[in-house]
């Protein structure tokens, strides 16, 4: 069993931000994220999870309107934690494998191997509008999963395209490759 903690602003309730003890800007407050991450790590949680979505509407939880995206906040949290896994959501429907592979590879290097990816396919068709697409251009469920499968193959291929010691940086010989 792996134990994970999700940092979700002030929570998943529509009115949680109104509670007297709530930190109303928690979804964009690095100090809050840092404290939560360090508490989770001290509590022996295995991983920290940052969810994300690409579409909001009138039914969305208010603090989802303004929140950190996972890669940046997890990279920052890597510098203030040392053991806890760092898992972020990223959609295969509205991103490119090369860029995402670089982002997660960077997070993995920054965190000394603690990166994880929650792969999603963005089910809400309104997401298309945020990427200059028409609603009808949003892929249906089977197509999103075909895209995701190919996307993961490409990402894994990019990550496995060189060995850890493939790059030579030898000061004595002057070889930098």
Where are these regions (language model features)?
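N-terminal beta1-alpha1-beta2 module of alpha/beta enzyme domains
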Residues: 1-81
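Short, charge-rich binding segments
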Residues: 78-83, 108-110
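Internal, glycine-rich beta/alpha segment that forms the wall or movable "lid"
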Residues: 96-177
């Amino acid at each position: 069993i792996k134990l994970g903690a999700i940092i979700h602003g002030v929570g998943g309730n529509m009115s949680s931000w109104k509670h007297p003890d709530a930190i109303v800007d928690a979804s964009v407050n690095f100090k809050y994220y840092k404290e939560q991450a360090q508490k989770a790590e001290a509590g022996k949680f295995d991983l920290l999870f940052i969810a994300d979505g690409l579409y909001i509407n009138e039914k969305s939880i208010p603090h989802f309107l303004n929140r950190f995206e996972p890669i940046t906040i997890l990279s920052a949290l890597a510098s203030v934690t040392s053991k806890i896994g760092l898992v972020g959501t990223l959609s295969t429907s509205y991103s490119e494998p090369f860029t995402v592979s670089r982002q997660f590879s960077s997070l993995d290097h920054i965190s000394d191997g603690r990166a994880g990816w929650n792969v999603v396919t963005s089910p809400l068709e309104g997401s298309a509008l945020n990427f200059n697409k028409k609603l009808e251009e949003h892929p249906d469920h089977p197509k999103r999963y075909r895209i995701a499968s190919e996307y993961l193959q490409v990402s894994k291929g990019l990550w496995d395209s060189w060995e850890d010691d493939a790059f030579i940086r030898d000061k004595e010989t002057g070889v930098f490759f």
